[in-house]
Amino acid sequence: MINDIKKDAQERMGKSIEALSRNLAAIRTGRAHPSILDSVKVTAWGSEMPLNQVAAITVEDARTLKIVAHDKNLSAAIEKAILTSDLGLNPSSAGTTIRVPMPALTEETRKGYTKQASGVAEDAKVAVRNVRRDALADLKKLTKDKEISEDEERRAADEIQKLTDKFVAEVDAAFKAKEKDLMAV
């Protein structure tokens, strides 16, 4: 039972870290990276589809992404989707190829993105701590129902705290890496 609680907590904390990674990847830096466009949805064939399912996205150079639509009729829809996304990008189209230059980030923009990354990291920490709270509540319930002793509960709670500390440290490390990436000129 205790192992199930710990395993569940570890899986849920891991999912929080995965979500953090996705959210941090969506915050753009000055460099071109295909994951910047992960949040872009294109209206294609009557439904909203992720951009990476309707086009090939490659890095042309350090500041330019190249997008080649799988279907040439989608080029205009892809360009519109990128323009209407809140990424602040201006694609230029040449036939079936769309180039997306990454504008240089100003100091003010960098600070804004760093603040956004900080908020995302804080949300991830809160999610990890909520998982800890749930796991500790489950342990308390087992102790109350006399399924485990108080000593076992205390030991398991210590292990869950260590797990929480480990995942919070991972969140901090991911944020520091993103902050360093954002502040690099």
UniProtKB/Swiss-Prot annotation:
GO terms of biological process kind: cytoplasmic translational termination
CC per GO annotation: cytosol
Cellular compartment(s): Cytoplasm
Pfam families per UniProt: RRF
Annotated GO MF terms: ribosomal large subunit binding
Cited SUPFAM superfamilies: Ribosome recycling factor, RRF (SSF55194)
Source taxon at top rank: Bacteria
Keywords annotated in UniProt: Cytoplasm, Protein biosynthesis
Keyword Electron transport found: no
Tagged with keyword Nuclease: no
PANTHER family registered for this protein in UniProt: MITOCHONDRIAL RIBOSOME RECYCLING FACTOR PSEUDO 1, RIBOSOME RECYCLING FACTOR
Family in the record: Belongs to the RRF family.
Record function comment: Responsible for the release of ribosomes from messenger RNA at the termination of protein biosynthesis. May increase the efficiency of translation by recycling ribosomes from one round of translation to another.
Protein name (record): Ribosome-recycling factor
Organism: Pseudomonas putida (strain ATCC 47054 / DSM 6125 / CFBP 8728 / NCIMB 11950 / KT2440)
Gene for this chain: frr
